[in-house]
Amino acid sequence: MRNPERVSLRPLLGGLILLLALTVIGATRFNSAEQREILDRTGSQLSAYTSTAAAMVTVWTGVQRDAVAEMARYDMLRLLAAEIAETDLPVALLRELGETPWTEQEHGRHSGLDARDRQALRDISPHATLIYRKFVEFISRHDFAGAALLDMTLEPVRLVGQGWQADTRTLLKQRRSKGALSGAGMLPVRLQGERLLVDFYCPVTAPGYVSADDSPQGILLVTCDIGKLLGG
């Protein structure tokens, strides 16, 4: 004979399970709404902080712009930009060698080069290696996040540190279409991971190293971590 108490508990147990399920669903919806609220609030704070930081960075450029412009006038930097502009070296190769000093061993291992390319790299290598060291020193002295030398197509041919993104090239192309790359400038503040970054650019120009229409042969791009800038 079945125990009547056990039978009578089944409906009660089922009701408890249903109640628990409804409670979990309700809590999940509440958490989702709460998360959305947190995200909205965080986004507003980030937007306000970005605006404030951008204003402070604008003031800061008045102090540090001379340092960036001085680096852009570095003779060897102009020479390398001009030499690269005169070659047809593959962009993929320049990117591959962009973050390390160029050496004969690296040139010899690269299978995508013909004799002309190898000769061009041998000619450029001393300048590129020297500029790499100059960039490292420049970044360290001014506490930048990174620096890059871009060629006439706005492709990076010399990269040191962090900060470069493909979107940066798109923004620079938009500036160039408006004729805004003829002088120093600042790109919009952006979020990369948990860091707020801002990019400063300056044309690499000098007599004898520019094209017939006086357009720059290269662009110096410097990335700054706003958190460090503001002492955060």
Predicted features along the sequence, with ranges:
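Intrinsically disordered, low-complexity acidic Ser/Thr-rich regulatory segments
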Residues: 106-137
